[in-house]
Regions:
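All-alpha RGS (Regulator of G-protein Signaling) helical domain and cognate RGS-like helical scaffolds
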Residues: 1-69
C-alpha cells in the first residue's frame, strides 16, 4: 500500500466481503432472529462500504442488488 486511496480500497473490499458473508449465511439459519441479526449486520457493512466509496469518489453501483450476488 502506497497511499490513502490504497488503504480505503482495501477497507472497501473487506466491507463488501463482510456484507456478502452475512448475506450468504442468512438462508442457513433456522432461527429467524439469527437471520435478522445477520441481515442487520450486512446492512451495517453496506453503510461502511458506501462511506468508503464516497470518500474514494466512486459512483454508486449501476445495478441495485450488487451485494450478495
Amino acid at each position: 500500500m502506497k497511499n490513502q486511496a490504497d488503504v480505503l480500497r482495501l477497507a472497501q473490499r473487506l466491507e463488501k466481503g463482510a456484507a456478502n458473508a452475512y448475506i450468504g449465511v442468512i438462508p442457513s439459519f433456522g432461527d429467524r432472529a439469527l437471520a435478522e441479526v445477520s441481515a442487520r449486520l450486512a446492512a451495517d457493512e453496506v453503510m461502511h462500504w458506501t462511506v468508503l466509496s464516497q470518500a474514494l469518489k466512486d459512483p454508486l453501483p449501476a445495478k441495485a442488488l450488487s451485494f450478495g450476488a
